[in-house]
Amino acid sequence: MVREDLILGIETSCDDTGVSIIKTSIARDNPEEINLDILSNKLASQTELHDKYGGVVPELASREHLRSLLPLTKQALFESDLDPSCLSKIAVTTGPGLKGSLLTGLNFSAGLAAALKKPLIPINHLEGHVLSAFIESKSSPRRNFPFLTLLISGGHTQIILARSEEHTSELQSPMYLVCRL
């Protein structure tokens, strides 16, 4: 027997708006084997807008997310040939990131989850980077925990210990080590 989930993912941690729908299939007798299909992956870039100002303007980023979220979600559902009621869960980035951008994505996702009576799954942006190695192909690679990874993303540089999918922790920030020298 296989458990399937259709998950809508919302990403608004900085200046790009991302909406994706994935289908996961997990064999009940072998939960280590997860098959993933990316049904839709939509992105609205704000690079051109922010380039005029020499960098990301948080208030503009939040407004652009607000303009982009509903159309991108509709496009993702259409491209996936899904009715919103078919979704199993809604996942949303909850940090770290720009507060206004995160709140825009969270409020949109929470409203959608409440309207559809679906669970809302908070996602740590940095943990998403760490675990993204497992979704590079339709059949995800075997998860060999624990593992160490060096994470460099935006203003974050960290050495992360991943004990499991649910348990990751920062061992040390290389910047902290440099400052101590």
Regions found by a protein language model. Give the residues of each.
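Single conserved hydrophobic/aromatic residue that forms the stacking wall/gate
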Residues: 165-181
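Short acidic/glycine-rich loops and adjacent helix/strand connectors
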Residues: 1-169
